[in-house]
Amino acid sequence: MSFTFLDWPRAEIFSSVSYLGLLLSGTVLYTVYKLIIAIYNYFFHPLRKIPGPPLASISWVPWYKYWFSGYMHRHVTRLHETYGPVVRIGPSEISFISATAWKDIYGLKRCRQIERDPQSFPSLTPNGARFDVLTYSPIDHAKYRKILNPCFSEKATREYERTIHENVDKLVAKLEQNISRGQKKNGSRENVTNWFQWLTFDMVTDVCWGRSFECVANEKSHVCLALSMDLVSYSSFIVFVAWWKGLKDFLVKLSGVEGLFVHLVRSKCEEHHLIAAGNELTGEKGKASIYSNLRAAGDPLDLAELDGNLTAIVIAGSETTGFALTATSYYLAKNPACFRRAASEVRSAFASAEEINDDALRKLPYLKAAIEEALRMTPAEPNGLARKVVVDGGLDIAGEWIPKGTAIYVSQFAANRSSAYFHLPNEYHPERWLGEECPKEFRTDKLDAVQPFIMGVNVCIGRGLAWMEMRVTLAKLLWHFDWTVKGGDGEAFEQAKAWHVWTKSHVNLQLHRRGALYGDL
C-alpha cells in the first residue's frame, strides 16, 4: 500500500516555513509569555504591595543566584534593612523578621492553615514520601510527635545525662593529651569544628542506641557522619529542581545517599537488639536510649517510620548542636572579657569537674546567656524554615494579607541581626540576655524575635536534650581549659556560607590548661 498522499502537506508546510522561522517564532512567543507573567507579577499579583526589589517580584533569577552563592542569609538581611520587616524576595515568597510573624506562621492555631513547604525542604526519598517527624502531613506529624514526646520528656532527658557526661569526658581527655604533647607556652591549636561535630554525633548516637560511633576516640568522622553531611548538602542542592518532580526523583534515586544512611541506621538498630538480648540473659540493665523507649511505646513505629525518625533525630541532633558549640566557643575566645566571666561563673560553682551536673548548670545565668547570644549571632538554620499557606482565601500574617500558595517564613539570621530589634546587632554581648542585670543600652532589644528552636507545633522536639548537651560540654571545657583565637583563625567562620545549615568552616582555637591565660578566675 502506498502512503504518498501523506507527503504532500508536509512538503508544502516546510517549503513555506523554515526551521529557523519556527525557532524564532517559538522564541518570540516564549518571550511574550514571560513578559506577560512579569507584568502580572509586578502590577497585578496579590503580593504586589509587599516591598522588595523589583526584579525579585517578577523573576526567580535573583533568588536562585543568592541561594546558589551560599549567601542568601546575608542578602535577605540587607533587604530587610532596606525595606523593613516584610520583604518579597521572590514572585510568591515572603520573608518576615518580627516576633509577631513567628507566632502567626509557626504558632499552634495555624498548623492546619500553614504547612511545611516540600519545595523548600524536599524529601530525599525517590517517591517524595516522608516517614518521620519532619513530614509534610499535619496528621502524620502529630502522630510521630505523640510517640516521640516521651523519649524527650524531662524525665527521659535526665536519664540521658550520664551518657552526655561520658562522651564529654572523652573529649576533655583527648584535648588534655594534645596539650601535654605540645609546648606549654603555646598550648595546643585545636580544630574545634571537627571536635564538636564528632562529639555531638557520638552523643546523639549514644543517646539513640546506647552506643556511639566513637568519632572522638578515633579522631575522625564515621562514615555515617559523613553521609549525614551529604544528606544535608544534597537537600540544599535538590531545592533547585524540587519544582520538577520527575527530575528531582531521578536525581534522588541516582544519589542513593539516604538509602545508605538508612542502612547504617538499621544496622545500629540490629546491634541494639543483640545487646538488649545479652543484657536480658545476664540480668544487666542497659543504658537509657531513645530506641529502647520507642520499642517500649504503646503505639510502636513500623520499620520505615523507625528508620525515618531515627535518621531525622541523628542528623538534626548532631548538626545543629555541634555548630552551636563551635559558635559559642569561638565568640568566647574572640571576647576575652566574656570568656573570663563565663569561666569564673563555672569554676566558682564547682569544686571539681566531677561535681558538674545539669541541675546546677541551669542556675548559672551567664553560661546560658553566652549560649543564647551565640544562637542569636549564628542560628542553626539561618535562612528560615519555609511554610506554605494552604487555606483558601489566604491569611493575615504580621499585618499583611498573604494569599494561598505563598511560601512564607521568618529569616532567622536577618531577624537576629536586625538593627531595628537589637543594639549592636553584629556584636557578641551575652549580657543582653541577663534580665534584670541587663545593661541599660540593651533593654530595648526584641529578644522574642530570636527563636533558635522554632516555636508552636513544630518546635524542636529535642531542645531540652540539646540544651543539656551544650551546658555540660561548655561547662566542662570552661572548668578545664583557657582558650583564645588568633587573628586569622576566625575569618572563615565569620564569612561562612549557608544553605539549610552552615558550611563547616574550620575554627581553630589555641587551647591551654586552666589558668595559663587568665590566672585564677
Curated annotation (Swiss-Prot):
Glycans are attached at residues 178, 186, 191, 309, 416. Signal peptide: none annotated. Cytochrome P450 monooxygenase; part of the gene cluster that mediates the biosynthesis of sordarin and hypoxysordarin, glycoside antibiotics with a unique tetracyclic diterpene aglycone structure. First, the geranylgeranyl diphosphate synthase sdnC constructs GGDP from farnesyl diphosphate and isopentenyl diphosphate. The diterpene cyclase sdnA then catalyzes the cyclization of GGDP to afford cycloaraneosene. It is a single-pass membrane protein. The gene is sdnF. Heme binds at residue 460. This is Cytochrome P450 monooxygenase sdnF. Keywords: Antibiotic biosynthesis, Glycoprotein, Heme, Iron, Membrane, Metal-binding, Monooxygenase, Oxidoreductase, Transmembrane, Transmembrane helix. The chain crosses the membrane at residues 19-39. It comes from Sordaria araneosa (Pleurage araneosa).
